[in-house]
From Swiss-Prot:
HAMAP family: 16SrRNA_methyltr_G. It is found in: Cytoplasm. This is Ribosomal RNA small subunit methyltransferase G. Gene3D superfamilies: Vaccinia Virus protein VP39 (3.40.50.150). The gene is rsmG. Pfam families: GidB. Its main location: cytoplasm. The keyword Ligase does not apply. Signal peptide: none annotated. GO terms for molecular function: rRNA (guanine-N7-)-methyltransferase activity. Keywords: Cytoplasm, Methyltransferase, rRNA processing, S-adenosyl-L-methionine, Transferase. S-adenosyl-L-methionine binds at G74, L79, V125, E126, R140. Its EC number is 2.1.1.170. It comes from Shewanella denitrificans (strain OS217 / ATCC BAA-1090 / DSM 15013).
């Protein structure tokens, strides 16, 4: 059931996935559903809704990623990082979260589904100091763009991109972008079977 739904959603989004990738995406939903009963990783309870609200919602960003190395901050159970890693095996994803149970889940997913391009780090974002800066910083969890840029400013290299996944756009929030950063693009995202607003904001440090 999940497999056929996933195939239909991917086709609707013009995303192509191998049989292995589709199996990994379905496996991720099944593991999330199983672990959620004991560890309360998400408020979404049904696998069908997890597929739409978590996996497909995450994958809407996939066509807009540029670069090789990404960090997903406040990733929770691995969103959007794990679905994006499955669909982009040529890219590397660091999944950052401060809660141990979420990191344990991610590591189990990595082991069971054999996802080789993710690494999980248990840390608060402001305390994490990467040896090599990232091409992109991803977030779908931060309360505001301002918080994301303030707490994550040290993570990308000078030309790296901040990818903020948002629901409805808040004009006040957009006007409060901190000094030294610029909004490059606002992209309207369409998630299959989800009648809610979704946007991707691409930002970076001002150059020069």
């Amino acid at each position: 059931m999940l497999s056929s739904q996933l195939s239909a959603y991917l086709a609707e989004m013009n995303l192509s996935a191998t049989e292995q990738q589709q199996g990994q995406l379905v496996g991720f939903v099944e593991m999330l559903n199983k672990w959620n009963k004991a560890y309360n990783l998400t408020s979404v309870r049904s696998p069908e809704q997890m597929l739409i609200r978590h996996v497909m919602d995450s994958l809407t960003v996939s066509p807009y990623l540029s670069g090789k190395r990404f960090i997903d901050v406040g990733t929770g159970p691995g969103l959007p990082g794990i679905p994006l890693a499955i669909m982009n095996p040529d890219k590397e994803f660091v999944l950052l979260d401060s809660l141990g149970k979420r990191i344990r889940f991610q590591k189990q997913v990595q082991f069971e589904l054999k996802i080789n391009n993710i690494s999980s780090v248990e840390s608060r974002v402001e305390a994490f100091q990467p040896e090599i800066k990232f091409d992109g910083v991803l977030s779908r969890a931060f309360a505001s763009v301002q918080d994301m840029l303030t707490w994550c400013h040290h993570l990308p290299h000078n030309e790296g991109i901040f990818y903020a996944l948002k629901g409805q756009l808040n004009q006040v929030e957009l006007e409060a972008i901190p000094e030294g950063f610029e909004l490059l693009e606002t992209i309207v995202l369409q998630v299959p079977q989800l009648d809610e607003q979704r946007h991707l904001l691409k930002l970076r440090k001002k150059l020069g």
